Structures are given as structure tokens and as C-alpha cells.
Amino acid sequence: LARQGGRTEDEAALRAAWYLRRDGDDPGPGGRILKAWRHLGERAAMLSKDWTINLSALFEVRFGDALDDVVMQAAKLAVGQGSAVAAAAEVAAASLHFVPQCEPLALWLADMVLAHRLKWPMAAPLIASQIRRGDLRAAGKAGAADEVWPKACALAYARAAASAADLYVDLVRRADRLLVAAPKLRGKDADTMVAILIMEDAQPAGAGKTASDRSSRRLFERLVALGAVRELTGRPTFRLYGL
């Protein structure tokens, strides 16, 4: 998504922008895209009554009839009957028609509608990583009878599901390894850090609630030595650790 929006940040740069910022700092344009997709995976994001105000802020789309129309369509499709993927494709096309300047909004709503239709407790970011830019451009032009976009959307979700399943298997294996190593840890905040590493993509080795900065660094060095986590940056300073 960052690249589609003309940004140059890769995964490592986005991770650094998010996890190394201070509370209240602007994570930058790329970091704001990451923020929108982190919000997608939160349980609170499922509440359609908050979509208009939250999406306006997340995607920097001004309030107006266009955004209202898209959100109303999404809320309607979220509780409808029929194919979940077809509903996701429909809301994405509607979003690109009404708010053509914001492709990420269309993909966010597609995943959200899909999650509602499938009765998931929260949404998962799926289509954005698999949809092709050319197919996305066609979506805003697709008519009601056009089959190009629905098929492209279905294929993207099929690829996304396979990729998500592979990632799940890998993360479960890595999380199990961390949990096996956890009883061997003796540092302050060790239990808290293990919980954070299970829940978050990355964690800086900074001071915790009771542990010093030095103690925290030793904890992460121990976890790396045990093969429980990886150092993700390759830098000697401002390091990040994760599964």
C-alpha cells in the first residue's frame, strides 16, 4: 500500500516508524497507512457507527456526501445475505466510484465487509497485499454486470487466504518456541515482554515498567540466544525484536 501510494518505505522502515516513535509523535505518511491497517484488526473497528469519523481521520478523507455514501453502502452490505467476497468486491467498487482518490479506503472497507459477512469477531487485513493495481483501477469503472473486478477480487482473496494460513502456521511455531523459553527468563518485566511479543509485530528493547534499559536489553539478548525471538533491524542501536 505504501508503494502504491508513491511511498518508498519498505517493511523495515514502516516497522521502525511505528515502534520507535514516541507517544504522540506523527509516524509519517507511511506510518499512518500502517495505523489504518492496525485499526482494521481491532475489535472496536467492527462498529459501523464509528466508521465515518474514524475513516475520515485515518485516510485523511474530508467529511461529505461521498464518504457518507460509501459508509452507508458498507454498513448495508455488512449485514446482507449472499457471498462475502462478492459483497467485499461491491463495496470496494462503490468506494472507488465515490472516493476515487483513496484506494486504501476501498480495500479497508472490503476486508471489513468480508469480516462482518463471515461473522468474524474482528477483521483481518487480506486483500491489500494481494490485489493487483490494474485490477484496482478497473474496479472503480466496473458496472453492475461487469465480471472482471469480482473475479479479480475473488482471486486476490484466495491468494490472501493461502498466504495468511502459511503465516499463521509460521507464527504459531515461533510463538510456541517463545512460550517454551519463557520459564527460563528471570528479568523484571519478562512476563510482560513475552505477552507483548506474542501480540505485537515488534518491540524495542527499552526500559519497561520496572526494568531498566540495560536489563531490558539483556532480556532480549537472552531471548535471541534461546532462539525465541529475532532481532529485526540488523542495526547496533535502535533495535527491534519480534517473532
Task: Place the predicted regions along the sequence by residue.
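FIC/Doc superfamily catalytic core
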Residues: 1-243
